Every structure is written in C-alpha cells, then in structure tokens.
C-alpha cells in the first residue's frame, strides 16, 4: 500500500511536495480508513485542482519513478527538471516512496541529475518503528555501500560484491540490479527479503493509469 510519495525538481514541482494517504484528524467515515497500530491510512484519495495546477505531473512523476525502478532510466529525460529556474538544471531531482508491505513500512527513494541522466543516491529504510533502520544507502561514487547490521556473513559479502560491481553505474538502481535473475539468492539468504519485497511491490502492486488508458478488471484484484 502506498502511504506517501515525495517529489522535488520534476516538471512543475520545484520544492519538495508530498502526496500522503495518512488520514487527518476528522473522525467521520471511519469505514474509509485502514488502521494499523497507531496510524490510519486512507483507502482511496482524490486530487482536486485547476487546470495546469500539476495534477497530471504528479501521476507522471510516480510513473517515471516506477519505470526507473523496474527498467532503468528512460531516455530523453534531460529537460524534465523543473524549468521555472535555470538553476534547477544542475540540482538533484528526488523521488521517495513510503509503502506498507504486510506488517512492515518501508521508505525507498533515489535522487538523480536529469540533465545528465545520472543517478546520484539511493536508499531503503525500514520505518515500521520510530527508530528508522537502514537497509541500504548507496552513493554513486567511490564510497562503499552502507548496509544494515542485520546482514552478516555470506549474505553481507554477496550484497557488497553486487554493489561493487555496479558502484559507478549511473543509470541503474541497486534495487533493480538486486532483482535481476536472482531468485535463488533470496532462497539462500531469506534475510535479504526486504529488497525483493519492495521491488515486487512496484512490479505487481503499483499501477499507474492515465485518463486515456483502458481500465482492466485485473486492476481491481488484490
């Protein structure tokens, strides 16, 4: 389930903006909410606004992020930064999702320079409890990947090997790489399950539809 989505420096979005499915303080319509621990999440939401106010661009931002996660950076993206200021050309664009999978909450995101088609950073956290737990943090440079302390032994060594093999790859996300023909990896090391679960959520649960797209009954099947 999508809980939050944050976007900055993309199309009409300049400063960071947040789309949140967390309920406000209104106590009516409790049947429209999903309760988990102390949090109440909306089952559905609608976005209202004038023409050219950014509604479609929010959907495009979600779609762009999902495509990048599942397939790699799209082509012809150099002008997709927010062009209200020419300075934005050299500023990072940031996408971040907070999602709920079973009884866990994850925060996954990445930043990139659209003008150069260059991924800069990537991160995945477990935010189920108030104490955020790092699963991994990646900076596309010479810096080594930061991994959770729960990964040890051969599992940790394997993660580092894959990270080192793509450390300078500026067009591919680590989460994507860790889900390319690696089914046996998660059977051998179940502790790595969060990397598989988050990717599978984007592949199987996160569906972006545009107004002109035909609606399939399959979209309504959980």
Task: Describe each model-derived feature in a short phrase.
Residues 1-5, 88-97, 118-120:
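Short, hydrophobic/aromatic-rich segments at coil-to-beta transitions
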Residues 1-64:
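Pre-Walker A-like glycine/lysine-rich segment at the N-terminus of P-loop NTPase domains
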Residues 7, 97-103, 124-126:
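Short acidic, glycine-rich loop/turn motifs
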Residues 12, 101-105, 129:
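Glycine-centered tight beta-turn/hairpin loop motif at sheet-sheet or coil-to-beta transitions
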Residues 14, 42, 90-94, 105, ...:
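A general secondary-structure signal for short beta-strands and their flanking turns/coil
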Residues 64-77:
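Post-Walker A helix-loop "phosphate-sensing" segment adjacent to the P-loop in P-loop NTPases
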Residues 77-109:
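Extracytoplasmic beta-strand-rich oligomerization domains located immediately C-terminal to a leader/signal peptide
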Residues 107-222:
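Electropositive, glycine-dotted interaction segments
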